[in-house]
A protein has these predicted regions:
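DNA-contacting surface of Y-family translesion DNA polymerases
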Residues: 1-115, 188
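Acidic, metal-coordinating catalytic segment for phosphate/diphosphate chemistry
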Residues: 90-193
Length: 193
């Protein structure tokens, strides 16, 4: 918008100045990566989704967030891409649940006509007032145990580095899995436009 740019250039911005302590609401947490080689099967995809989901869920736990919507991004070798999303059973920040849901969404939506070049994963629709409903199937208790395990793994990674502990899935191809979106995560400034 040319008029807006001209106003900014002249210093005519009339929006109120925000206080330095005011933070923006977080709307999503995600990571994406271009892989070092093309992905050719579901096992390759699971390795990448495992690394991405562990990073995303770790960042959500650090912020005390649980998300209810999962999105995946897939780009193939010829740079055709798509995004798909699904609602999760309940708000979660458990990496295993995110991996399982991402793989289920991927398997339903990709037919392997072409190798994959890039994958992404994000969680949105955060439940800030999370409370769980009473459940006879004990899924809430299972989720709490998994959250405690993930939190213990986070503490180990914080203390000894990202590669001190991990899921066995990522050991099938260390060339694919040897990246750390959690450590390499960059937050880019938001444009006023």
């Amino acid at each position: 918008n040319g008029i807006l740019l001209r106003q900014y250039a002249r210093g005519e911005d009339k929006t109120p100045v925000r206080h330095k302590d005011i933070e923006r609401d977080i709307k999503s947490i995600g990571n994406a990566t271009t892989t070092p080689r093309d992905l050719v099967n579901n096992n390759d995809v699971k390795i990448i989704f495992t690394v991405l989901a562990e990073s995303v869920s770790r960042r959500m736990r650090n912020l005390g967030l649980k998300g209810t919507t999962l999105s995946i991004y897939v780009r193939d070798k010829k740079l055709g891409s798509f995004v798909r999303q699904c609602k999760l059973e309940s708000a979660t920040n458990v990496s295993g649940e995110i991996i399982k849901s991402a793989m289920a969404l991927f398997v339903i939506n990709y037919d392997w006509k072409m190798p994959i070049r890039s994958l992404g994963l994000s969680v949105t629709d955060f439940d800030f007032d999370y409370c769980s409903q009473f459940d006879f199937s004990k899924t809430v208790e299972k989720r709490e145990k998994l959250e405690k395990i993930d939190t213990a793994v986070d503490a180990l990674k914080d203390r000894y580095g990202n590669y001190c502990i991990g899921r066995g899935t990522v050991l099938f191809d260390t060339k694919l899995s040897h990246f750390s979106p959690y450590d390499d995560h960059n937050i880019h400034p938001v444009s006023p436009l």
